[in-house]
Amino acid sequence: LECHNQQSSQAPTTKTCSGETNCYKKWWSDHRGTIIERGCGCPKVKPGVKLNCCTTDRCNN
């Protein structure tokens, strides 16, 4: 599986995630604006953090 792993609005980069079946994108707002984190897997998130998990290559941009 290939997942995006760039932060927020940086140029897209990807990572090969061996053994993973999910990519994730999670985002939240703070004093800096909206922060977006992308990567492999499907993590548990704290209340107030939005999470999108998906199962195809580069689906989490």
Swiss-Prot record:
It holds the Pfam family Toxin_cobra-type. InterPro entries: Snake_3FTx, Snake_toxin-like_sf, Snake_toxin_con_site, Toxin_cobra-type. The keyword Secreted applies. Its main location: secreted. Signal peptide: none annotated. Disulfide bonds join C3-C23, C17-C40, C42-C53, C54-C59. Keywords: Acetylcholine receptor inhibiting toxin, Disulfide bond, Ion channel impairing toxin, Neurotoxin, Postsynaptic neurotoxin, Secreted, Toxin. GO terms for molecular function: acetylcholine receptor inhibitor activity; ion channel regulator activity; toxin activity. Expressed by the venom gland. The keyword Disulfide bond applies. GO terms for cellular component: extracellular region. It is found in: Secreted. Coiled coil: none annotated. Binds to muscle nicotinic acetylcholine receptor (nAChR) and inhibit acetylcholine from binding to the receptor, thereby impairing neuromuscular transmission. Belongs to the three-finger toxin family. Short-chain subfamily. Type I alpha-neurotoxin sub-subfamily. This is Neurotoxin 5. It comes from Naja sputatrix. The lineage of its organism: Eukaryota, Metazoa, Chordata, Craniata, Vertebrata.
